[in-house]
Amino acid sequence: MRPGAGSESPSDVGCDVLHVDMDAFYASVAVRDRPDLAGQPVIVGGQHRGVVLSASYQARAVGVRSAMPMTRARRLCPRATVLPPDFEALSGVSAAVLEVFRTITPVVEVLSLDEAFLDVSGARRRLGSPAQIADQLRARICDEQSITCSVGVAATKHVAKLASRQAKPDGVVVVPAGEETAFLHPLDVAELWGVGDKTATTLRRLGLNTVGDLAHTPLPILRRALGPALSAHLHDLAWGTDDRIVVPCRGPEEPERSIGADETFSRDTDDPAVVVKELLRLSAKVAGRVRAAQAAGRTVTVKIRFADFTTITRSRTLRDATDVTAEVYQTASDLYLALGLERARIRLVGVRLEGLMDAAKATRQMMFGEREHGWSYADRAVDQAVMRFGRAAVTPATLLDMSRPG
């Protein structure tokens, strides 16, 4: 499925979505600036405590993974060179790569420092087929920044994202329009965008181990296990159905399109219950601010800062934009729990809702167990009570016995 650079590829007709993902970004930038480490196992993160932010492919070959506790990573790869993240260098490379994207197309949706979606439908006449554009991008990024990236080319965002994973490292995978199911169905069910550890466990208990298994399971069975909204969403993705478009990120002159909040604990904590409760409080705060701005957002981002001041973020893009506290919190807590940080000492947590749009233009599906507009109406009732009586008037029961950090 990988076309050669500069070649015509009839298989990419209709495949206007590119997902571009830098390869082992933090580690690649570190090695770029330390040529003596080329080809060696490198881990980026805290020296002793904290977690792995990134690992070179040589370190990954022995099992080192992002978000793994550093003590375990050192046991797996004692020969690895451990380096702290150079956020100034990372930000500079990320900005330069974004400028490369914008010379290709203005329709760029940035997901993080090291990945983005591009809609190249308007660039075909000028630059060639999507597969050719993907090769041009890779060549420019390698020439200008001395790092590699992988590109998935497909008709939809979901398939393009999965294709870029298959392309790693330093490759291009094209999934021809109409051949999505042949690509998707052999994949592990956990590969589906939106399937976290908890959902994957539920699916495996049903004997659903591949995307194809899920696709061929009757919806009523999936609904009983996952609820109506998630089951329908995953069933659509399993059949290659994804109507989400590439949403351009803001330019430098445009207003901020996210709202967030974070909290520093008075003492570092390794108690997941304390972290989850704080995520609930922050989710309520962020969602309230979003509603006050008459907005809604599609991407929930969680920030975790460890005792050694290393920081990681994890994001998930929802099917529909939301301003609902319960949805923000559920996603934020899932992102945190999926990291498995039970023994890591945490100094700060944050929640951010990104990709904001006018709430009047946003649509949303109901959550599992939610009556029509239930959570939305409940949030607005809380907002009215807070406006009238103050923020202490309405507090989630879970927070009543919580010792606030700071």
Explain the meaning of each model-derived region.
Residues 1-234, 288, 372-406:
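Gly/Gly-Pro- and Ser/Thr-rich, intrinsically disordered tail segments characteristic of DNA damage-repair
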Residues 10, 184, 191, 199-346:
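DNA-contacting surface of Y-family translesion DNA polymerases
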Residues 20, 118, 151, 302-304, ...:
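Preference for bulky hydrophobic residues occupying beta-strand positions
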Residues 25, 49-51, 307-311, 356-359:
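Short, charged/polar surface micro-motifs in flexible loops or helix N-caps
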Residues 68-76, 106-113, 209, 247-259, ...:
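Short, compositionally biased low-complexity segments
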Residues 111-115, 154-157, 295-299, 344-348:
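Short Gly/Ser/Thr- and Asp/Glu-enriched loop/turn motifs at secondary-structure junctions
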Residues 116-122, 313-316, 358, 363-366:
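Short, hydrophobic beta-strand segments
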Residues 320-406:
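Acidic, metal-coordinating catalytic segment for phosphate/diphosphate chemistry
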